[in-house]
Amino acid sequence: MININVKENMRLKTKTDYCIRVLIYLQSHEGRVKIQDIAQSYGISKNHLSVAVNKLAELKYIITTQGPKGGIEFNKEAQNKTLSELISQLEDFQIVECFDPESNTCTISAHCRLKGMLNKANSAFLNELKKYKIKDLS
């Protein structure tokens, strides 16, 4: 019998959660805000939140400004991107070993149906999230 621990495997990474929280916060606050303010609001370490902020900046969901009057703000050009697009950029969705051909050592993967089932589940999840835009978060 195949045992899939949904609590462990079908879960977004903490970084993805923090990225979504940052976007929600920024959409509900006008102008530039400090990472520290967001960290305090959510009770999250500033250092951990900074990792999410850097990723969002790299993906162009937010705009960062350095210096004493610096901070971060929502990139309005990202508001029409879908949640599916965001989460696909942040997650690898390699739920089981056979999803990664480079590290797959499973001896039954050529005959196993599980990979197809999980691919369908992932597709359904991402297709559902295509219905929602980043602007819908707040």
Where are the regions that the model predicts?
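N-terminal helix-turn-helix DNA-binding core of bacterial DNA-binding proteins
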Residues: 12-14, 18-44
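Basic amphipathic alpha-helical segments that dock to polyanions
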Residues: 52-57
